[in-house]
Amino acid sequence: MMIYNSNNIPAIHTYKDAVRYGARVLKQADIDNPDYDALELFLYVTGIDRTTYLINATDEIDNEALRKYLVYIIKRSHHIPLQHIMGYTYFYGRKYIVNEHVLVPRQDTEVLVEEVAKLTSADSRVLDMCTGSGCIIISLASLGHTYSGIHGAVGVDVSLDALEVAQNNKDINNVPYVELIQSDMFEALEGRGMKFDVIVSNPPYIPTRVIKGLDEEVRLHDPFIALDGDEDGLKFYRIITDKARDYLNKDGYLCYEIGHDQAAKVSDILSSYG
């Protein structure tokens, strides 16, 4: 652990001084992309954009902003995710609130959104199982690739805390017709006559035994429930694939995000359930 106090902080007068110092602290703490994170935290604290920073890099930083900045730098040096410190991230060009109750949306999942968008239109009914932050279903709705009527865009999650985050993201992205349902998989959907053109899911898919070896930022700060795919990582693919036929329209699609080494096994699951 690294501890910083007034005795080991060099003189910091300008914007540039602060960011350089922040980057140095993060580099010493083995943070990936320390320069990027140091600048992002500075922009967050000061409320300026990159262009303003570059133009005014030699401006004097006020003491209160510097104090806040150093607090955030120390948090980041302890491997608290950048997005958790700021409370938001960007996904598919839109802002999303994130916290310890949801996975931070990742670039790989943007690819899933792109692929589903190719299969959908403004008339499509889409179910996002294990919705988490809501980034998948909200992105599709924002793109106009879901039906805007009842049950046109549905996100399901077992976690009420995650659904609270998704509700906030639905509000800030102005897609009021996205329906969020608390349910253990399909349980709360049974008997409601819901049918979908696409079921999409980025479920928990990491084998339990692997989680303890994950990067500290994931292992300690992402919710375990959103990571753990049981013994072989495939539990939720089996459940969703088994139930999907009851909720898909004829010629509907089932779309998954999968782990880098799971393609063959998930294909086998899909084949085994027809």
Residue ranges and their predicted role:
Residues 116, 140, 218, 240, ...:
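Class I S-adenosylmethionine-dependent transferase superfamily signal
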